[in-house]
Amino acid sequence: MESNISFLIPTLNEEQNLPFALESCSFADQVFILDSGSTDRTKELAVRYGVHFVYHAWVGYAGQKNWGLDNLPITSDWIFILDADESITPELRDELLAISTGKVMTDKTGFYVNRFFIWEGKEIRHCGYYPSWNLRFFRRGRARYEERGVHEHMVVDGPVGYLKGEMRHEDRRGRDYIWQKHLKYAELEAREMVKVISGHAIDGLKPSFFGNALERRRAVKERLWPYLPVRWLLRFFYMYILKKGFLDGAAGLDMCLFMTQYEKEIARKYSEYRKQLHK
């Protein structure tokens, strides 16, 4: 039976993660690996699993995925964007198929999907990282990513819903790699903060203290967070105390401390870029 779903998976050197992602979406009619120059076994794995492998030079997190949505020969009515370090749970698979095959009728254009993180081998169910809603499942031709440097969100033309099934997020490339990735994120986040204070707002997810969870988070990030002192300390208090990271045990504490260091890097880069702005 056809699933009427196509998956788009952006990749760069994902040989350690990709098999888990591909196994989890084997029910799809089409799977497109959109690669930006892997030098490991990513392409070999794509060939082994019999999925489409397409190279496109990196144009940013949002731009890369939007290019794929515009140019890949996707034929399914429904599309799912999956990161290579994520996988679909059986419960989510069944829910997706019920919608895509018409067993469950819906007027929604897109759906938010929750995901849980694996950190140091343990599921994280607190720390402000659960629930973690991401709009990933949508009708073909009805959604695009906002043009943001990092942590971009999907903008959908039509009503949206929320699914019960979850994604699993686990990056298996090691702590050093994850830290280097967050250093890149810190640079991009700092640049986005400078854009906001200089009046160059992006056209995408609208910040609102009275909107949904993502809109509230964006409002805090853009309208409040850049102006607060010792943001790294506030982030630890938020994650470990307010969001009960302590309930996730040693892994929860480790994750909170890791993200505190990440926040310090954002603040350092932000200060650096602001000085450049006023020269």
Give the role of each language-model region.
Residues 4-6:
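Cell-envelope/extracellular polymer assembly enzymes that use nucleotide-activated donors
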Residues 63-66, 90-274:
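Catalytic-site signature of metal-activated, phosphate-bearing donor transferases
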Residues 8-27:
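Short, well-formed alpha-helical segments that are part of the catalytic scaffolds
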